C-alpha cells in the first residue's frame, strides 16, 4: 500500500552501519524531523550522523498529506485558554516561522518538490461559533486569519477560517534533496542507547548529543512518553479526474474530511481513530465519499498514516529528560508534522548550539505544569485496559473458520493466537502480546495488521514490527492446511 508520494519518488539506497561511527550529534530517525534537524546542526558546523531503521522517509513522512501550515485545526483558542496568550503565541510564532523558513529554503536552493503557496481552511458543518472563536484567536496571535461565511468547498458547511499564505508540497522530493547532503545509515535500527552510545545490530555510534526523532521514542525510562501519548491512525485516498478549488481544507468535526490537491489529483483523508480500535470500513467510507464529492473520479492510491497525540495538546520538543541532559526529543506532532518538524529542527538546533530558544517553553517536555492530568489519567486507563486483556477470554473460532483475507483471534494447533488466513490452505499466526509492554494486540481489517491499543505498535501478518515503540518482531509461524 504505497502513498502517492511513495509512488512518485524513490530515493537512493544507502548502506547500513558496520562497525563504529563518531559524531558530535547522532540523530535517530530519517524522516522530516530527523533530516531537517541533522541538516541545521550540520550547517552550524557540527558533525552529524543519522541512523534510520528502514530508509529515508520510509515512516510517517511518506504517508502524510503534506499540508505545510500554521493552522492546526481549532487549536489556538484552546491554547490561549489553557496555557495563556504568551505560550499560545510561542506555538503560533514557531509554526508560522517554520512555514516561511521551509518555503524560503525550497526557493533559495531551487528544490524541485512541487511547492505551491496556498491558503489553509478550517471548516465546520454547523459550528459557526467555534470557527469565530478560532479566527479571533488566530488573529490575536498574529496569524493572517479571517472567518469566511462562504468557502470554495464542494460541501455544505457553515463557513471557514481562512489562513492566508500557507503551502503544500511533495514531502519525499523535498526530503531526498536534503538527505543527499548528510551522512545517513539506512537499515540501521537503534536498539539501545546508553549515554552517548547508540547500539545497532552491526555497530555503534558515539556522540556527544543524541536526538530522538523516530516518531515515537522507544526508550520507556526516563521520559515516560508512553504514559503521555497515544497513537491514532487515519486514512487517505488520491483521486484522479477530480478537481478541488485552490486551498487546503480540514474539518472541525471528527467525521469531517481533509482535502488538498496534488498535480491533477485530489487527496481525500479522514477516519481517524485510536490505534488498535478499528472496526474496519475506513477505505470503503473514503471511496463512498469520493464518488459523492467527485463523481467519476478514479483511485490512484490509498494509504494510511499514524500520528502521536500528546496529553498536553502540543508536541514534546526539547530535552528528553532531566536525567539525561545530552538527549533531545521531538515527538507528538498531533497530525501536523510538516510545520512542527521544521519548528523542531530550529528549536533543537538552538538548544544544542546556543543553550536556549525564545519559543522553547511551550514545547518543553519537562514542564509538568503544562501537562493535563485528566488526559494522562485517560492514557493510563487505556493502557490498563489493554494490559488487562493479555489473555483471551471466552471461545474463539478455529482457524479454518476464518474466511480468506480475514484475521482475528483463533485457535490453531490447539493454541489461541492471532491468525490471518492468506489462502484456503495457508495461515499466518502470531502471538497476541505486544513485545513493548505486553498489551493484547487487536486486528486491523483495513490495513491487515496487528495493532496495539495501548501505545500504538503495529505488526504485519507475519509478525514483523511496522511502527514503534516496539522494537522486536512477534513470535510467528506459517501453517498450511493439511
Each model region followed by its residue ranges:
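Extreme N-terminal leader/targeting segments of oxidoreductases
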Residues: 1-25, 464, 474-475
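Flavin (FAD/FMN) cofactor-binding and adjacent substrate-gating region
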Residues: 2-8, 74-80, 101-174
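N-terminal Rossmann-like FAD-binding beta1-loop-alpha1 element of flavoenzymes
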Residues: 23-50
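Glycine-rich FAD pyrophosphate-binding loop
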Residues: 43-63
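Helical element adjacent to the flavin cofactor pocket in flavoenzyme catalytic cores
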Residues: 136-138, 160-208
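C-terminal catalytic lobe of FAD-dependent flavoproteins
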Residues: 253-254, 278, 283-285, 294-380, ...
Amino acid at each position: 500500500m504505497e502513498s502517492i508520494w511513495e509512488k512518485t519518488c524513490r530515493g537512493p539506497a544507502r548502506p547500513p552501519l558496520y562497525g563504529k561511527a563518531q559524531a558530535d550529534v547522532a540523530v535517530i530517525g530519517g524522516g522530516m524531523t530527523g533530516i531537517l534537524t541533522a541538516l541545521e546542526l550540520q550547517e552550524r558546523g557540527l558533525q552529524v550522523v543519522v541512523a534510520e531503521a528502514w530508509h529515508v522517509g520510509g515512516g510517517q513522512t511518506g504517508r502524510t498529506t503534506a499540508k505545510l501550515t500554521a493552522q492546526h485545526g481549532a487549536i489556538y483558542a484552546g491554547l490561549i485558554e489553557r496555557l495563556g496568550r504568551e505560550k499560545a503565541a510561542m506555538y503560533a510564532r514557531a509554526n508560522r516561522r517554520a512555514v516561511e523558513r521551509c518555503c524560503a529554503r525550497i526557493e533559495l536552493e531551487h528544490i524541485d518538490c512541487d511547492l505551491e503557496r496556498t491558503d489553509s481552511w478550517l471548516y465546520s458543518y454547523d459550528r459557526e461559533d467555534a470557527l469565530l472563536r478560532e479566527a479571533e484567536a488566530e488573529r490575536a496571535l498574529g496569524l493572517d486569519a479571517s472567518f469566511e461565511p462562504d468557502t470554495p468547498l464542494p460541501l455544505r458547511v457553515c463557513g471557514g477560517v481562512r489562513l492566508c499564505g500557507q503551502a503544500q508540497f511533495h514531502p519525499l522530493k523535498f526530503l531526498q534533496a536534503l538527505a543527499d547532503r548528510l551522512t545517513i545509515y539506512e537499515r540501521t535500527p537503534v536498539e539501545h542507547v546508553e549515554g552517548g552510545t547508540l547500539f545497532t545490530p552491526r555497530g555503534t555510534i558515539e556522540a556527544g548529543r543524541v536526538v530522538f526523532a523516530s516518531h515515537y521514542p522507544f526508550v520507556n525510562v526516563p521520559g515516560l512518553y508512553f504514559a503521555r501519548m497515544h497513537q491514532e491512525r487515519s486514512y487517505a485516498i488520491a483521486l484522479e479526474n477530480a478537481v478541488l478549488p485552490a486551498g487546503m481544507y480540514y474539518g472541525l468535526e471528527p467525521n469531517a474530511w481533509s482535502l488538498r490537491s496534488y498535480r491533477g489529483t485530489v487527496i481525500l483523508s479522514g477516519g481517524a481513530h485510536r490505534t488498535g480500535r478499528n472496526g474496519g470500513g475506513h477505505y470503503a467510507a473514503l471511496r463512498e465519499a469520493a464518488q459523492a464529492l467527485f463523481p467519476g473520479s478514479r483511485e490512484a492510491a490509498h494509504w494510511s498514516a499514524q500520528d502521536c497525540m500528546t496529553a498536553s495538546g502540543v508536541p514534546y520538543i526539547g530535552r528528553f529528560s532531566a536525567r539525561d541532559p545530552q538527549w533531545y526529543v521531538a515527538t507528538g506532532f498531533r497530525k501536523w508534522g510538516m510545520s512542527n518538524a521544521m519548528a523542531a529542527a530550529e528549536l533543537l538546533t538552538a538548544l544544542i548550539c546556543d543553550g536556549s530558544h525564545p519559543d522553547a517553553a511551550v514545547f518543553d517536555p519537562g514542564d509538568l505544569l503544562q501537562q493535563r492530568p485528566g488526559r494522562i489519567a485517560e492514557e493510563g486507563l487505556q493502557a490498563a485496559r489493554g494490559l488487562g486483556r493479555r489473555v483471551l477470554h471466552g471461545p474463539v473460532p478455529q482457524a479454518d473458520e476464518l474466511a480468506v483475507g480475514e484475521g482475528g483471534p483463533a485457535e490453531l494447533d490447539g493454541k489461541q493466537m492471532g491468525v490471518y488466513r492468506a489462502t484456503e490452505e495457508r495461515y499466518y499466526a502470531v502471538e497476541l502480546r505486544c513485545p513493548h509492554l505486553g498489551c493484547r494486540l487487536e486486528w486491523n481489517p483495513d490495513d491487515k495488521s496487528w495493532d496495539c491499543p495501548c501505545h500504538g505498535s503495529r505488526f504485519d501478518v507475519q509478525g514483523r514490527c511496522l511502527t514503534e515503540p516496539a522494537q522486536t518482531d512477534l513470535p510467528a509461524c506459517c501453517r498450511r492446511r493439511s
